[in-house]
Curated annotation (Swiss-Prot):
This is Ecotropic viral integration site 5 ortholog. GO terms for biological process: regulation of cell migration; regulation of protein localization. GO terms for molecular function: GTPase activator activity; small GTPase binding. GO terms for cellular component: cytoplasm; endosome; Golgi apparatus; vesicle. Transmembrane segments: none annotated. PANTHER family: RAB GTPASE-ACTIVATING PROTEIN 1-LIKE, RAB-GAP TBC DOMAIN-CONTAINING PROTEIN. The modification Phosphothreonine is found at residue 33. It comes from Drosophila melanogaster (Fruit fly). Functions as a GTPase-activating protein (GAP). During border cell migration in the ovary, acts as a GAP for Rab11 and is necessary for the maintenance of active receptor tyrosine kinases at the leading edge. Signal peptide: none annotated.
Amino acid sequence: MTLTTTTTASSAESQAKMDVKGGALPGEENLPTSEMDLLAKLEAANKLIESDAKSLNSLHSTHSRKNSDTSQISLTSSGNSVAEEDIWTTWATILNDWEGALKRKNPCVSELVRRGIPHHFRAIVWQQLSGASDGDKKQYAEYIKATSACEKVIRRDIARTYPEVEFFKEKDGPGQEALFNVIKAYSLHDREVGYCQGSGFIVGLLLMQMPEEEAFAVLVQIMQQHRMRHMFKPSMSELGLCMYQLENLVQEQIPDMHIHFQQQGFQTTMYASSWFLTLYTTTLNVNLSCRIMDVFLSEGMEFIFKVALALLLTGKDTLLCLDMEAMLKFFQKELPGRVEADVEGFFNLAYSIKLNTKRMKKMEKEYQDLKKKEQEEMAELRRLRRENCLLKQRNELLEAESAELADRLVRGQVSRAEEEETSYAIQTELMQLRRSYLEVSHQLENANEEVRGLSLRLQENNVSIDSNNSRQSSIDELCMKEEALKQRDEMVSCLLEELVKVRQGLAESEDQIRNLKAKVEELEEDKKTLRETTPDNSVAHLQDELIASKLREAEASLSLKDLKQRVQELSSQWQRQLAENQRSESERTTNAVDSTPKKLLTNFFDSSKSSEHTQKLEEELMTTRIREMETLTELKELRLKVMELETQVQVSTNQLRRQDEEHKKLKEELEMAVTREKDMSNKAREQQHRYSDLESRMKDELMNVKIKFTEQSQTVAELKQEISRLETKNSEMLAEGELRANLDDSDKVRDLQDRLADMKAELTALKSRGKFPGAKLRSSSIQSIESTEIDFNDLNMVRRGSTELST
């Protein structure tokens, strides 16, 4: 009978272990479909475990607890294989009842995650921790069929993602294709984020553990729940916040390193931006990255900050002795090797770092305020730049308009002077023509009188043929003189018409001058407004010099034009006089042929007298013209000198006026600065008094808080001890109840009694030593409860086996 019971017990125990590993638990047929799928995944994972040599040794071990003398011997003899088997079974039970574990907020889950998730369970646990849904997996198939605008960029960056990993080495291989599909699908899923280079390393780490659909679902949850999508947006607002928080944490927890970084100009973004964008996948190896991802999915972004501080603390002694370039090389090459040398120590250091959530939120608020101020300042700066550009354009337009109006004014003055000169010349010519007309009319009257006298002589005396010929010649001369008088009359009429035209032009020029004067007045008003704006001394000086140079240039051009016109007039008059002299000589020669000797003598004497008279008149005219030109040149030179002196006086007066205004402004600013300094000193004294009062209040409040904290910690410790005591009592009562209900199973009862005795002995020993911390005792009690639950399951299986044998 004893032989059959022992064999059935051992077979039942092994069957129970296999059921736990395979996911076949009691009541499996009543589970929903989602849990059935989870159990199927666990079975697939267990098959992979059985293929491993270590796991096979642990699974097919023939060691049984009932063959051991005491429970203490069984616990120590199991070794690493039993501990690994316990981890596997613990994860299997947690995954079987994942929702229940989350509802109870089982602390064992986070503790197990910190120890490291087994490789074969990692894919399922990551999905459960991230909360990946089936809806994202269904959308993945639709996204693969679509096309993305980022495909070329993704293809370019895939070859640079995990180049040392065998799965991603082959070009256009299954690894690279899977990586491309997942990244493309997420770029279509979240079009605001699209594609960022750092996301490829996170996707590659997920694809090393799970298929494409599951990796896509986990990636979506990572981006949404842990605010990673804000880090990959084009603005990268979350990355800036993380850098600001990390810099403040380094300043608070590692102040000497922060001072060294500030002295070397080593910004936080130079070494930490890739840590947060890729979750340390580009810095550490794959195994360490997987463990960081385990805790990141469980605890969130806070653990990434802890890892960053742990890395800085690991290399602190070396970093304090390096410059900026050497620090960059150290972060890239030496620091990962130091972490890999002591992985558990590194993670324990990271777990030991404490972060205050209130302080982190306060830093986030400070960063948002800083960003808001920066945006306001940038908006104000952009507005001022736009206004400055508009003012510059307006100033340039006003300068161009003023220059154009000044040019127009100068041109108007020049044209007016030219018109005055032309009108003066026309008037002088008109006066000359009138004089010549009077002379010619007087000569015509004399000629008419001579004709009358000659006609009377012809009637009285009959002269010879020679006299008739002479009369005919005199008549011809008179006809020629009449023709010359007619030509002069025509010239006078033409000159009168030209005079009318010139007067019309003068009227038009006067109208233009009025318009120009009105514009000049407007320009003077604009100049007054511009002068009131108080430009810089250099600009004002240049403007004054420009106006003066333009006026000088205009005056010089006017004088040059006047001189040219005078020279042309003199040359034209000289040529005209030469032509008239030649014409008169030719007429004299023609008349001399037909005239008598007596007339020739009289004509010769008359011509000599007239030529002498004309020469004298010409000489006097030339001398007067030359004197007039000399006086005009002297007058213009004097005017230029006067203009220069006036401009210099105006420039000097403007400079003196501006200097006086600047002096007044400087005095006012000095007085304002003195008053401000006094106000600021008074405010500083008030602030110092307030600061001292606040400091004293803060010290009092801090002492009160410390006292309250110690009291609360004492009450918490007492409550924890009470909870642990009640839990141990509960476990003892449950064990005693099971023992009373199952008195037939003698072997199991003995084992349980031995275990209870050992536990009681341990409890008494701990109490006697005084080492009874709440958290450790609670965890040990939980482990003991779990082990007793497993033993109770074994006991139920034994019961079933005995009933089957009896039937």
